[in-house]
């Protein structure tokens, strides 16, 4: 293969807290979210080519488009219309699962294509999706606005996360439509100095989309109950617009044992929360 081939990693994006604080006149929702990344994700390989192509492989490839409907393809068209590249996406994250799989893939594609094509990634990546700028940033951050305002947060304490999806896809538009209000209070100022104080801070936050997502997919409530009952699970919540849920654990052993105790027909994985 060409020495110019790019191989990149697209880690899962997790909204540990997600407040919906308003709706703009153009229809976009204003968000305030603590976003982190987990040590599990998709992989993307890009090689120079005359024409643009996308091959989707991996254990979560079913149902993922391999054409212009895919955010990876859209990222290429947005960055440099008409340029060619052969892209292979190895899918490990659930499609439409609320953990930014498509956005993380698009961000990885932008980095790789910029390298292959020797171009810069311009501002405005939120045009591809609200989560794309934060996935380009790739570090723990407070995300506000329509995903375009990124603020630094205190260093995260070491922790592990168990991610669970019971096989449900929850359309983001339907979740927003089902919300009773979209003018909720913002996040409290991020402040913590260890795992326990971080959990205290999290308890003061919400996912404003969780209730409406559960009305669309009641199994989300079942997943959260199963997570809460696991030994060592210190905090549970739904990520993004659903339907992936998470549990936070202090140690790898606790997270691993918890993951092993969940139904085998669900998508379940455990990983460290990436601190930088």
Swiss-Prot record:
It catalyses: 4-CDP-2-C-methyl-D-erythritol + ATP = 4-CDP-2-C-methyl-D-erythritol 2-phosphate + ADP + H(+). It comes from the Bacteria. Gene3D superfamilies: 3.30.230.10, GHMP kinase, C-terminal domain (3.30.70.890). ATP binds at residues 94-104. Keywords: ATP-binding, Isoprene biosynthesis, Kinase, Nucleotide-binding, Transferase. The keyword Transit peptide does not apply. The active site is at 13, 131. Belongs to the GHMP kinase family. IspE subfamily. Catalyzes the phosphorylation of the position 2 hydroxy group of 4-diphosphocytidyl-2C-methyl-D-erythritol. This is 4-diphosphocytidyl-2-C-methyl-D-erythritol kinase. It comes from Jannaschia sp. (strain CCS1).
């Amino acid at each position: 293969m060409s020495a110019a081939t790019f191989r990149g990693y697209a880690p899962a994006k997790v909204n540990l807290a997600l407040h919906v604080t308003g709706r703009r006149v153009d229809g976009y929702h204003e968000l305030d979210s603590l976003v982190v990344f987990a040590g599990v994700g998709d992989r993307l390989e890009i090689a120079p080519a005359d024409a643009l192509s996308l091959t989707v492989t991996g254990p979560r490839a079913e149902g993922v488009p391999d054409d212009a409907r895919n955010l990876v393809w859209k990222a290429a068209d947005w960055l440099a219309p008409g340029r060619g590249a052969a892209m292979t996406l190895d899918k490990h994250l659930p499609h439409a699962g609320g953990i930014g799989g498509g956005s993380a893939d698009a961000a990885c594609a932008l980095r790789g294509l910029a390298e292959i094509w020797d171009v810069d990634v311009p501002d405005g990546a939120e045009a591809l999706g609200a989560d794309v700028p934060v996935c380009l940033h790739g570090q723990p951050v407070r995300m506000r606005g329509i995903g375009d305002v990124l603020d630094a947060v205190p260093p995260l304490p070491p922790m592990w996360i168990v991610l669970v999806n019971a096989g449900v896809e929850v359309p983001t538009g339907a979740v927003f439509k089902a919300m009773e209000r979209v003018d909720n209070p913002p996040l409290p100022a991020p402040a913590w100095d260890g795992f326990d104080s971080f959990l205290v801070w999290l308890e003061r936050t919400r996912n404003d989309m969780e209730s409406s997502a559960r009305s669309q997919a009641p199994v989300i409530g079942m997943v959260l109950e199963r997570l809460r009952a696991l030994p060592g699970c210190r905090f549970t919540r739904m990520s993004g617009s659903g339907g992936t849920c998470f549990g936070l654990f202090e140690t790898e052993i606790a997270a691993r044992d918890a993951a092993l105790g969940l139904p085998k027909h669900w998508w379940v994985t455990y990983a460290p929360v990436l601190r930088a």
